[in-house]
Amino acid sequence: LYETTNKYFSFTFNKVKHFADCRKIVYFQSSGRNVRIATTHGNLLCYDKLSKIIKELPPNLFVQLHKSYIVNISFIVEYSANEVVMSDGVHIPISYSRKEDVHNFLRLNY
């Protein structure tokens, strides 16, 4: 269902195939199997697990901060030990179990 070709993330929702430019995806937020894709042009919806989605995204552009969030590091405007702030003002927590990996990733890629 998911693929990234030429930096596009594709997914099927309600039997319709959608394409989202990875460079315009701000973050993914899951609630159960519902995943909201926040983009610079509004929100999209798909059904899946973040653990599957993260494998399909450009690895140097996206990082999973929490069991419920994957973020595009291009849209992080500030980060601290416990959270990041996205360009749209949303504060996203960094889980304790991912904290060290996230900070190492951000040091290398941000």
What are these regions (language model features)?
Residues 1-87, 91-94:
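Conserved binding/recognition cores within well-folded domains
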